[in-house]
A protein has these predicted regions:
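Short proline/glycine- and basic residue-enriched helix-capping loop/turn segments at helix->loop/beta transitions
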Residues: 64
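A short beta-strand-loop-beta hairpin characteristic of the jelly-roll/cupin
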Residues: 70, 79-106, 116
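A short, N-terminal "cap"/entry segment at the start of jelly-roll beta-barrel domains
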Residues: 1-57, 72-73
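Asparagine-centered strand-capping/turn motif at beta-strand->loop junctions
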Residues: 121-123
């Protein structure tokens, strides 16, 4: 993990996400791909959400979980999450008590409804 990533790890630092978004008139682009903030053992690049493009229910971000790392159990209460797995594989444990499990591989697309408890293990 780079020094920058260590500095961002789980800081909860508030970042102005608008500065990474270009666009107007209904089409928006995020062009910054470096990690800019950390939360729950996940490193995030700029993404698209209500905070910067006005999406009411959907959040999509570039996120990195270090090899062998875990994003501890959590719930997204007010928004949906869409994930495209670029490389590697992860195990999602989800549902009440996180008792269900599914393995995702590079190339998989994942959709998580609001209110679903889930924990992610980078395998």
């Amino acid at each position: 993990m780079s020094e920058q990533e260590n500095n961002l790890k789980n800081t909860g630092e508030q970042v102005d996400l608008n500065k990474y978004v270009d666009g107007e008139g209904g089409i928006f682009s995020v062009r910054q791909l470096e990690n800019i903030r950390g939360w729950n053992n996940i490193q995030y690049g700029a993404g698209l959400s209500e905070k910067n493009v006005g999406s009411k229910k959907l959040s999509m971000n570039l996120a990195t979980i270090p090899p062998g790392g875990v994003a501890l159990a959590h719930i997204h209460v007010d928004f949906e999450v869409m994930i495209y797995l670029l490389q590697g594989s992860v195990r999602h444990e989800y549902g009440p008590g996180c008792k269900k499990s599914v393995i995702h591989e590079a190339g998989d697309m994942i959709f998580i409804e609001p209110g679903i408890p889930h924990e992610v293990f980078n395998m």
